[in-house]
């Protein structure tokens, strides 16, 4: 049986991307093979992986088993019997954190730039007196939601088995959610699973979000989503909240940016209203907290959030967190909080691939009731790779230019509308600039990028530069090879695959690549 699994794993590794193999196949464990019953049993480490492997890979694994034993073999996927031991509840460490003076926190909170103007306060929770008291004491600013924004669209959640398709299974019928519910929760009713474009970059995060929305407090608690700016983290957590509200409009849900949570802690301290503050946050059914990295260095805020987190988990309430980086890479956050973040499911959201970027543009254009030719969408998607917000901004420029000049949207019109943006992109993201940036970063000479030298301190940065050239420019593999001293395209392909595979395993390398990408993108 072990010989079979070794051979099957090798075959699957050659068929799948490194990330797919590492995420789905590597964690599986062959348990037994019954020759009389022709039954192979394979264990998955948790329910999420079990369901996904059964829906996505069971047929291929069964086919490999039949070929190996040269007979019909049934494959049974089960939950790892030792999974429960690994999921044992962590005991809360109640020793107080080092306290930072609240005056200092107040200054830090005020120093953080706010992206949105001050907004009027909305009505507090009416269901519970404690919620009303907390709102009054903390003087929490709640964004106004225009009544026209309350979407009447259906809330359909695609099944995890078909992550690349928008739409799918319908949610159970539910009473309409009125505006005041969204005002209390701070949820944006426009951000749903229905209008989230799904691709390889976010399919795992979306599948986890769907699972949590259907089983709050039971599946993956907390759910921790991380990735760069504009990749859809906020959209996903709003979609979870909106789905839960459709099923239960009386659910106590709160979306809050970490910066606002810091401000609430400061206000509660100033008004001596911590009891009300705690009663409110500890009584929620779902807490959605965005950009948790803003807690860095704010010890009193971390203290209060720790107690809120413990209370919510103990009450089987769901906690969902987003950040721009992996939990253990956040600086200035207490270790016991980091361990809590790591105790659930942590999922990365990557920049969208080409096909997903095209789908996003077409979806956004459809929402604007504008027809954008597919070749235009591909042109934009090929040149803009960073995130969804960048794509949205480019589309707005194209539409504005087209309307102002009274021209149909073509590639020529698009090129003219985006000429400034494309000039910046082409100037910044060139192979030559990548080579210089990598050489400076790793303290080698630019000439080493073209040389035939093979010491590790030179070969490694050169491979990283090749990887970035493939990811961030439009150059083909032969063109990149030519710019790296006339190397063969297979050498470039080897470097790209090697760095891509190691990036998914090596946190330090991933951090270095993130820094280089941000430097190159300006």
Swiss-Prot record:
Residues 186-402 are annotated as: Domain III, AAA+ region. Its main location: cytoplasm. One of its GO terms (biological process) is DNA replication initiation. ATP binds at residues 230, 232-234. Residues 403-522 are annotated as: Domain IV, binds dsDNA. Keywords: ATP-binding, Cytoplasm, DNA replication, DNA-binding, Lipid-binding, Nucleotide-binding. GO terms for cellular component: cytoplasm; plasma membrane. GO terms for molecular function: ATP binding; ATP hydrolysis activity; DNA replication origin binding; lipid binding. PROSITE patterns: DNAA (PS01008). Residues 1-71 are annotated as: Domain I, interacts with DnaA modulators. Residues 71-185 are annotated as: Domain II. It is found in: Cytoplasm. Oligomerizes as a right-handed, spiral filament on DNA at oriC. Belongs to the DnaA family. Plays an essential role in the initiation and regulation of chromosomal replication. ATP-DnaA binds to the origin of replication (oriC) to initiate formation of the DNA replication initiation complex once per cell cycle. Binds the DnaA box (a 9 base pair repeat at the origin) and separates the double-stranded (ds)DNA. Forms a right-handed helical filament on oriC DNA; dsDNA binds to the exterior of the filament while single-stranded (ss)DNA is stabiized in the filament's interior. Domain I is involved in oligomerization and binding regulators, domain II is flexibile and of varying length in different bacteria, domain III forms the AAA+ region, while domain IV binds dsDNA. This is Chromosomal replication initiator protein DnaA. The lineage of its organism: Bacteria, Pseudomonadati, Pseudomonadota, Betaproteobacteria, Burkholderiales.
